[in-house]
Design a protein with these regions (language model features):
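Nucleotide-sugar donor-binding patch of glycosyltransferase catalytic domains
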Residues: 128, 229, 263-302
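Donor-nucleotide binding loops and adjacent catalytic segments primarily
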Residues: 2-7, 168, 173-244
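Conserved nucleotide-sugar phosphate-binding/catalytic loop shared by glycosyltransferases and other
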Residues: 6-73
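Conserved nucleotide-sugar donor-interacting segment of glycosyltransferase catalytic cores
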Residues: 79-135
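A nucleotide-sugar donor-handling region in carbohydrate enzymes
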Residues: 121-198
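Short, polar loop motifs at secondary-structure junctions
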Residues: 18-24, 94-98, 147-152, 195-198, ...
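A donor-sugar binding/catalytic signature common to diverse glycosyltransferases
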Residues: 90-97, 102, 112, 234-278
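C-terminal amphipathic helix plus adjacent low-complexity
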Residues: 300-330
Length: 330
């Protein structure tokens, strides 16, 4: 999205606040715009506690994390207000609640861009009264550009505009280059992205496939698997070069798989949170994915590689144009 905003508006500058672990990636990806981009660290204290051994959420630990985070939000918002640079024309968030409190206080447009908010997620672990401060912060947003695979009506932002799906642009020549390098005759090439929470050494993988995988995964012995370099800024092209995608239920990779027209396997957690449940529900409606448990990974077969029946459009430029219009750029 940042790339699309900067491409569409040559006069635009961005102050991009993101997790310290994302700063290097953001700098590399946006390197042709660095004269117009300021990168600064931001750490959200919200955390879903995941039980790796059982591939499920630890509800008690997550509840503690949510309550601690909500208690700290007012002070965090004050700190963000102090850090707000001069000359800002809009605050965009995906989907940090403090951003909207800061925008409201500064008299700026507060624009959300997401398929969910942390309010719906927190509601799965805490009572309505406990998360009311979170609702109040989100209600200060002026607008949500609401992606598909959404938690929908449960989102506490009143003004919503459907935004479809977006991802970074695909590059056909780069996709062909990756496929020539890794695709072997008579073998399916699978994009594997399940984060660091799943121990594949313990669970195993189907040896009938070859894999391109992202960091945080330890593939078991006897599997042909190639690590995508951690510094790669075009993982969407690696995904598009593969014959199918195996991923946990995260929005970005699911959206990329749908937009790249790839057969999709979604690995479910044992007790999914609100965003995961919303994504799975919509994928079921579309018949766009095969749902699997982590333990089924060694048993996948090529017969399950069903082509996508629906076609999706990358709305990245449209969403960027809507943001720029709200920010007063034409």
């Amino acid at each position: 999205m940042s790339e699309a905003l900067l491409d569409l508006q040559p006069e635009l500058g961005l102050v991009l606040r993101c997790h310290p672990g994302q700063l290097e990636f953001a700098g590399n990806y946006l390197r042709r715009f660095l004269a117009r981009v300021e990168l600064t660290p931001f750490v959200s204290q919200f955390q879903i506690a995941f039980d790796e051994a059982n591939w499920c959420i630890d509800n008690a630990l997550t509840r503690q994390s949510v309550l601690r985070w909500i208690a700290e939000l007012p002070q965090t918002a004050v700190g963000e207000q102090v850090r707000l640079p001069a000359g800002i024309r809009a605050v965009i968030s995906d989907i940090v609640p403090e951003a909207f409190a800061v925008a409201k206080q500064a008299g700026l447009p507060g624009i959300g861009v997401s398929n969910y908010t942390w309010y719906e997620v927190a509601a799965g672990f805490c009572g309505p009264g406990e998360i009311e401060p979170l609702r109040t912060m989100y209600e200060q947003a002026d607008l949500l550009l609401n992606y598909e695979l959404s938690t929908g009506a449960a989102i506490p932002i009143r003004s919503k505009i459907p935004a479809g799906l977006i991802c970074r642009p695909f590059n056909d020549s780069r996709i062909a280059e990756i496929r020539i390098r890794y695709k072997q005759p008579e073998r399916s090439l699978i994009f594997l992205s399940v984060g660091g929470a799943l121990s594949l050494e313990r669970i195993g993988l189907c040896a009938d496939f070859d894999y391109l995988y992202t960091r945080g995964i330890n593939p078991p012995a006897g599997i042909t698997a190639h690590l995508i370099a951690p510094e790669a800024t075009d993982t969407q092209n690696y995904l598009a070069a593969c014959d199918a995608v195996i991923t946990k239920c995260g929005w970005s990779t699911v959206a990329e798989a749908l937009l790249a027209d790839k057969p999709l396997f979604v690995v479910k957690s044992a007790n999914g949170w609100a965003e995961e449940q919303a994504i799975l529900s919509r994928l079921r409606d579309w018949r766009a994915a095969v749902e699997i448990e982590a333990g089924q990974l060694p048993c996948l077969n090529c017969q399950a590689l069903v082509p996508q029946q629906l076609r999706f459009e990358n709305n990245c430029k449209t969403v960027a144009s809507q943001i720029l219009q709200r920010a007063g750029f034409g």
